[in-house]
């Protein structure tokens, strides 16, 4: 018996040693640098900490724009160079068009039967239906819905402001985000009088938050196959949470199917049912889940960050408020700014861009898989490798004063771009050759692999280094909708209230990590403007 135990012990030690060597020794040529010594079994997972994107960004400063880490069984390549991301996501899109098939994603997506995580072949079909439905949806109708929900939101805040009580804004912002998406998608909204703590809000927000936390976490059973049995009960709980959202949307689907008027579709779900001739029930429900979760949560998270940065930067808040006042100088209603005034508020728009640069809600995006062996910026990427885009790292390592909240940088950037276009047009008219710099950004003139080197041709090229909605064919399809919702909600908050912390001190701006990053829970003080 003792000899058997000893044999098992030595076999385990041998397997651990083999795994350690596998993770730390490579004979493949031209592979990117490794992130450091990886532990057996767990790889680099224990090093990631509470905010993996910050650890990976710090690592990029040492290892460069492309490097590899081990997340359990998976060798993962981290792209923190914007040109590397464009090479993979745009130029080599077909090879990087699929996402990893993790257990968590399989559960959420109904075996990859949605938009966000579907395989390329299914994604092409689904995206065609969704794009067609979006095209047939009137932009004015969506704008009216957003403005209506913004009005309701402001009414709730006024009640708190009049009472003198501080407010925890997160549930109200979440309600706004859910109503915009569900109103557009299903023609159903949570009543303005319904509590944010009970009823439909409770039924939706609790499982939505749980699902986002799970999908964004470094789940051990998604990366270490031998640990999957240990997480059986956790996975069963996750299935129930996903099922709660599915059941809610299934009820809505059944109502739409029963009352469908093919001549007068009233929302996106009607249009999808008509386009698919009612044959893709499960797919439509899962696309609805994608929209409800991603659309509502990302917009809500960005609004939370907007409020925090306005409180922590009162001079910016004051300047933005004055711009809103000026935009309404010829309007009768001075207490609500419509979406039509968006282009009259360039400083507000620069604030949103700066918020998304500092705190892109999807800090690591959704990973991709290399379908075939390829090269990115001269480095070999083996077949089957997972690839992460470090959105957070790019918008910090390629920007001057990266940790400073500075909306003015976007105003100046636009001026420089416009001036450059004028010069290029002038050169073309004069018949001169226009030289375009396609310099490799991983290796700078000094052969350094530091991604934040100011010799890089894209350093401070903000549109290229700040990509909160990603790039390529599988970038966020709801970016335009999100921008409209953010402008309407955030501008009207600022127009009606002065935002402050309850103690007059700056609010902790450390993020809470997940598939989208949120602020920590904190109350704020609202002062109704005259």
UniProtKB/Swiss-Prot annotation:
It is found in: Membrane. Its main location: membrane. This is Probable cytochrome P450 519A1. Its EC number is 1.14.-.-. GO terms for molecular function: heme binding; iron ion binding; monooxygenase activity; oxidoreductase activity, acting on paired donors, with incorporation or reduction of molecular oxygen. The gene is cyp519A1. It is a single-pass membrane protein. The chain crosses the membrane at residues 1-21. Heme binds at residue 476. It comes from the Eukaryota. The keyword Heme applies. CDD domains: CYP1_2-like (cd20617). It comes from Dictyostelium discoideum. Its cofactor is heme. It is an enzyme of class 1 (oxidoreductase). Keywords: Heme, Iron, Membrane, Metal-binding, Monooxygenase, Oxidoreductase, Transmembrane, Transmembrane helix. InterPro entries: Cyt_P450, Cyt_P450_E_grp-I, Cyt_P450_sf. Belongs to the cytochrome P450 family. One of its GO terms (cellular component) is membrane.
């Amino acid at each position: 018996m003792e000899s058997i135990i000893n044999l098992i012990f030595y076999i385990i030690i041998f397997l651990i040693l083999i795994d350690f060597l596998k993770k730390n020794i490579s004979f493949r040529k031209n592979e990117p640098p490794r992130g450091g010594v990886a532990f057996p079994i767990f790889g680099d997972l224990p090093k990631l900490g509470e905010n993996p994107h910050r650890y990976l960004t710090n690592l990029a400063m040492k290892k460069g724009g492309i490097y590899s880490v081990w997340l359990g069984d998976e060798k993962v390549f981290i792209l923190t160079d914007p040109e590397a991301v464009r090479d993979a996501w745009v130029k080599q899109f077909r090879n990087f068009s699929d996402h990893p098939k993790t257990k968590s994603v399989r559960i959420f997506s109904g075996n990859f039967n949605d938009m966000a995580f579907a395989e390329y072949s299914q994604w092409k079909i689904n995206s065609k239906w969704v794009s067609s439905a979006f095209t047939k949806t009137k932009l004015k109708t969506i704008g009216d819905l957003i403005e209506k929900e913004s009005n309701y939101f402001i009414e709730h805040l006024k009640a708190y402001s009049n009472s003198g009580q501080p407010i925890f804004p997160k549930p109200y912002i979440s309600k706004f985000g859910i109503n915009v998406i569900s109103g557009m998608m299903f023609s159903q909204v949570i009543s303005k009088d319904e509590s944010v703590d009970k009823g439909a809000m409770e039924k939706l927000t609790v499982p939505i938050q749980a699902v986002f936390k799970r999908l964004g976490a470094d789940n051990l059973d998604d990366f270490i196959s031998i640990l999957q049995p240990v997480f059986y009960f956790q996975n069963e709980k996750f299935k129930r949470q996903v099922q709660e959202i599915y059941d809610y949307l299934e009820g809505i689907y059944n109502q739409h199917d029963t009352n469908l008027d093919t001549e007068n579709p009233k929302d996106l779900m009607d249009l999808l049912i008509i386009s698919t001739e009612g044959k893709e029930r499960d797919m439509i429900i899962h696309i609805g889940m994608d929209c409800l979760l991603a659309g509502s949560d990302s917009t809500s998270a960005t609004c939370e960050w907007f409020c925090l940065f306005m409180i922590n930067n009162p001079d910016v808040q004051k300047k933005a408020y004055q711009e809103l006042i000026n935009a309404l100088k010829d309007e009768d209603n001075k207490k609500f700014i419509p979406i039509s005034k968006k282009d009259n508020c360039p400083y507000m728009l620069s604030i949103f861009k700066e918020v998304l640069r500092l705190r892109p809600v999807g800090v690591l995006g959704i990973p991709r898989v290399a379908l075939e062996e390829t090269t990115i910026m001269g480095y070999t990427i083996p077949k089957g490798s997972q690839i992460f885009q470090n959105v957070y790292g790019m918008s910090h390592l390629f920007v001057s004063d990266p940790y400073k909240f500075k909306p003015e940088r976007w105003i100046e950037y636009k001026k420089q771009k416009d001036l450059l276009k004028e010069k290029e047009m002038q050169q073309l008219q004069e018949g001169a050759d226009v030289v375009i710099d396609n310099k490799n950004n991983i290796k700078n003139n000094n052969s350094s692999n530091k991604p934040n080197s100011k010799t890089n041709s894209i350093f401070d090229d903000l549109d290229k280094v700040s990509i909160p909605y990603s790039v390529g064919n599988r970038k966020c399809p709801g970016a335009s909708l999100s921008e409209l919702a953010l402008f309407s909600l955030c501008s009207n908050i600022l127009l009606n209230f002065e935002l402050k912390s309850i103690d007059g001190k700056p609010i902790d701006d450390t993020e809470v990590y997940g598939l989208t990053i949120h602020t920590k829970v904190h109350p704020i003080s609202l002062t109704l403007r005259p």
